[in-house]
Amino acid sequence: MFGAVVVGAGPCGLAAAIALKKAGFSARVYDRDCVVASITRYPTYATFFSTAGKLSLGGLPFVVPVAKPSRRDALAYYRAVVTHFGLDVRQYEAVESITRAQGTFRVRTRRRGEEPREVRANAVVIATGYWGSPNRLLVPGEDLPHVTHAYGEGHHAFQQNVAVVGGGNSAAEAALELWRAGAKVTLIHFGPTFDKKIKPWILPDLENRIAEGSVDVRWNCRVTAIDHRVVHVRGALGDEHAIPADHVYLLTGYSPNVDLLRASGAAIDPETGIPKHNPATLETTVPGLYIAGVVVAGFDANKVFIENGRYHADRIVAGLMGRPAPDTPGVSRDLDG
């Protein structure tokens, strides 16, 4: 019997495991992928917007020789976190179901190619993030091999026609990197301009590339189908266009997957996607079932990051121990409108 099971080995899940262990709870972490799998999906040469101190966990210093760490730095740091704190992390073991009975939870898991297993726990923390659930366009051709919902690097697109779908930070950065790698870039967005939350140091650069004709842009257009060499789009007036594309990047964001929470009996707000919960403790409508990380923000994934999601663990532990919630930043009740 574990004191708690944590579902998700991202930074917020690891933070929860550390806090639980420090408080004397036995804890095991499960993830269907590797440790901090979400970060492995960042662009290969990505640099964080935050300083290293804001990404650190459990008081373990995140030391890098530059102001802001790279993707590679972060992967190395979070591996060190698991080792340093001796966390019990079961990678590549998916949680299939969570059932509450007689005051405890039965957690059913399965490793690839193996029979299911079951463990019991007094509490469960869901910290599954959202990178596994891209916002799909639901158009023909979306699953073709040259179409992806993630951007890695631009080298393979050298002298190729590429289409980038989206109007946020990921799409903007990818468009710039692909252009610098020698690709012929067309940016497609259903809106009339870029998203409001785009980073201020990215926007002028991309606007200049568009103004000089280096990057083509199609505003107010929606993708209707994807072929092997062409993306079909429809404009606001119903006009149809075929855009050459050897590679297609659908950078339209992600949404948290709440299927496991819903199947466990937790209530989910249908409009916001936020699991109903106590903002002081992050306990859901199922006693003993807690949430941490981006899932706390529902469909608005821009409200919870590593910087504030790592503090969710302190609220959860306080709730489990019957103590007043600590005054930590960035939890659900502090999310701006």
Where on the chain are the PLM-derived regions?
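Predominantly flavin-linked oxidoreductase catalytic cores and closely associated redox partners
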Residues: 100-103, 114-187, 191-205
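Beta1-alpha1 glycine-rich phosphate/pyrophosphate-binding loop at the start
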Residues: 6-87, 172, 176-200, 270-271
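FAD-site-proximal beta/loop scaffold in flavoenzymes
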Residues: 142-156, 254-303
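A Rossmann-like FAD-binding core segment of flavoenzymes
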Residues: 86, 90-121, 180-272, 324-336
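Residues that mark the start of a beta-strand
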Residues: 3, 25-26, 160-162, 184, ...
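Short glycine-/acidic-enriched loop or helix-start segments at secondary-structure transitions
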Residues: 16, 39, 100, 135-137, ...
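Beta1/beta-strand and adjacent pyrophosphate-binding region of the FAD-binding site
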Residues: 1-12, 159-168
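A conserved FAD-binding loop/helix module that cradles the flavin
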Residues: 292-337
